[in-house]
Amino acid sequence: MEQAPEDQGPQREPYNEWALELLEELKQEAVRHFPRPWLHNLGQYIYETYGDTWSGVEALIRTLQQLMFIHFRIGCQHSRIGILRQRRARNGASRS
């Protein structure tokens, strides 16, 4: 009868450690792009909704990732990533 192979790969860091490190990196990046009162209110909302639980940590990570993605996609002034809105010439002349 076949047996499942033993885990011989490299040790992975625990999920909790990884989640906390990811949350810290996201918070540091979010502070550069969003007003602190917004982020504080988001944290308060998550805390009031989930309490001090891992579900709250996961919800905050997910929300910050979505906010950062949309922020960069729309076009962050600090980044070259995003939608570039070109100005149109008023006389109808093309820029090509």
Curated annotation (Swiss-Prot):
Q: What are the alphabetically sorted keywords of the record?
A: Activator, AIDS, Apoptosis, Cell cycle, Host G2/M cell cycle arrest by virus, Host nucleus, Host-virus interaction, Ion channel, Ion transport, Modulation of host cell cycle by virus, Phosphoprotein, Transcription, Transcription regulation, Transport, Viral penetration into host nucleus, Virion, Virus entry into host cell
List, in alphabetical order, the GO biological process terms annotated in this UniProt record.
DNA-templated transcription; monoatomic ion transmembrane transport; protein homooligomerization; regulation of DNA-templated transcription; symbiont entry into host cell; symbiont-mediated activation of host apoptosis; symbiont-mediated arrest of host cell cycle during G2/M transition; viral penetration into host nucleus
Q: Which subcellular locations apply to this protein?
A: Virion; Host nucleus; Host extracellular space
**Entry-annotated residues carrying Phosphoserine:** 79, 94, 96
Q: Which GO terms describe its cellular component?
A: host cell; host cell nucleus; host extracellular space; virion component
Q: What is its main location?
A: virion
Q: Name one Pfam family in it.
A: VPR
Question: Posttranslational modification, per the record?
Answer: Phosphorylated on several residues by host. These phosphorylations regulate VPR activity for the nuclear import of the HIV-1 pre-integration complex.
Q: Which intervals of the chain are annotated as region Homooligomerization?
A: 1-42
State the similarity comment: Belongs to the HIV-1 VPR protein family.
The protein's role, per its UniProt record: During virus replication, may deplete host UNG protein, and incude G2-M cell cycle arrest. Acts by targeting specific host proteins for degradation by the 26S proteasome, through association with the cellular CUL4A-DDB1 E3 ligase complex by direct interaction with host VPRPB/DCAF-1. Cell cycle arrest reportedly occurs within hours of infection and is not blocked by antiviral agents, suggesting that it is initiated by the VPR carried into the virion. Additionally, VPR induces apoptosis in a cell cycle dependent manner suggesting that these two effects are mechanistically linked.
Q: What else is known?
A: HIV-1 lineages are divided in three main groups, M (for Major), O (for Outlier), and N (for New, or Non-M, Non-O). The vast majority of strains found worldwide belong to the group M. Group O seems to be endemic to and largely confined to Cameroon and neighboring countries in West Central Africa, where these viruses represent a small minority of HIV-1 strains. The group N is represented by a limited number of isolates from Cameroonian persons. The group M is further subdivided in 9 clades or subtypes (A to D, F to H, J and K).
**Mind telling me what this protein is named?**
Protein Vpr
Q: Which organism is it from?
A: Human immunodeficiency virus type 1 group M subtype C (isolate ETH2220) (HIV-1)
Gene name, Swiss-Prot/TrEMBL: vpr
